[in-house]
Amino acid sequence: MRTFNFADLLEIVAETVPERIALVHGQSELSYSALNEQSKRVAAVLSSHGVGRGDQVGLQLINSPEYLTGFFGACRIGAVPFNVNYRYSPNELHHLYKTSRAKALIFNRQFSREIKDACARNYLPPVLLEVDGNELGLNLVDEITKVSVGHVEKLNDTDLIIIFTGGTTGYPKGVMWPHKHLFFSALGGGGFFHADGAISEPKELATRVSEGMLLVTMPLAPLMHGAALWTTLIALFAGHKVVLSDEANFDATHAWQLIREQQVNIVSIVGDAMALPLVEALEANQAGLEQDRWPLDGLFHIGSGGAIFSQTLQKRFTNVLPNLIVSSSLGATETGTLGAGELETEEGIMRYAPRGDLEVVVDGMRLAMKGEEGILARSGMVPVGYFGDEEKSRETFVTIGDVSYALGGDAARREEDGSVTVLGRGSMCINTGGEKVFPEEVESTMKAHAVVDDVLVVGVAHEKWGQQVAAVYCANVPEVDEQQLREFCRESLAGYKVPKVFFRVDTVQRNVVGKPDYAWAKSVAEDAPS
């Protein structure tokens, strides 16, 4: 009997369209049959080294077929795959290996030094599998040749996947998702490309795949980022082709070349940090500076999740490609994908029409009344907690009445008509003279100004107001009239939300997938000469 375990779902697709191309990476292609077979062999390797149900398997890999075969291979034996941010310091890696209780680690050779340094702090995953060498661990390719695919573990809907958060407010936390819950809450339940919506039984996936459109999807963020992994899995479980860049670091020019060569239809990004270089390269191409080397007839959608995709940049994309659909979706590792707000809003960053799975929770104990603010929450198929952290789990995953909720961290308000306005990241809220200011709203306004390329907004100490609003920004012109910036902001924002001080930098610092580094921005603002 088929389950919603992701290895089972991949096998359903592979049995339905075995010869269809599943994955393109550089010059290599994998059919669905080959992807499924290689995943089984990785599962056999893990099993041969004592890895089994419930054991944690880390994936410290750049975007590559091995990331996915490692992921599905772990799923196939009931083990628990988890993402490892390869930009972490040895100290952060040590913390991650130890707290995750990793039984196995699949990694690229280029990370051997960092892994050695981390393991020198007295925790070493027992099974080390190196995909492109044997400097530190066993060579995965060699190990695959030694095994045969034998007994298949009985799979369950409740087998777990752990997704570690970005760690922007301290060490990362591992969110434990049952496969079935993640399939429906983050991947749309197989319904993103079908008018009938989500499936109800795993076997229905075969019909969806055989009858569906043949689309090409390209995630530009690393697969270690939840949004990129979710985009990839959505495409694979729809029988689409997934294109992964063979460049270790994001490069807009290379991305457009791949989009053209592979006739990509759907591109997934993470916020303005990716959107800005992409649209600048696109505009240069459109202006003839690149001699129109990127005909993009097949591209119809660019979607962002995990960070702000500003309206200004969305408009720049559609100015060049008028038929392009651009979207910005809200979501979190703890809540899954919430989608784009359907309603216009004069405040905050997004507004949702009333729906059964979205609520505003106050103090983690009760649902908000109309007009009341709290934390945005999702009910239904939600995670079961943070791995190894019962205290944080109790704070984030709550039960009200007999309904389970996951709190995503965004402040929100229940409106009089039942709709929900998302105000911004609650942990970043600035309190100035008793008024709340959410950085994302101010950042979106500033980014609409033609000279501002990127900005982070933080609160800094103020003798009278407690905190004042500070903007750390970079610009595309030599000189900026900051008073003019204030006046521009005041056209859209209440006076207390307008930045009182500005700090210009060469580059606004973000992490590898474009998420803001607010600690850095705060240090810039606080350490600047007064």
Name the predicted role of every residue range.
Residues 48-49, 76-144:
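Structural core segment of the AMP-binding/adenylate-forming
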Residues 2, 28, 45-88, 436:
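Conserved AMP-binding/adenylate-forming
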Residues 31-33, 160-197:
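Conserved AMP-binding A3 loop
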Residues 237-240, 265-269, 280-348, 357-359, ...:
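Gly/Ser/Thr-rich phosphate-binding loop
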Residues 88, 95, 105, 260, ...:
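AMP-binding/adenylate-forming catalytic core of the ANL superfamily
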Residues 147-166, 170-173, 207-216:
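Conserved pre-ATP/AMP-binding loop-to-beta segment of ANL
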Residues 1-4, 135-159:
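Flexible, low-complexity linker/hinge segments
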Residues 186-219, 224-268, 281, 285-288:
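Conserved AMP-binding/adenylation subdomain of ANL enzymes
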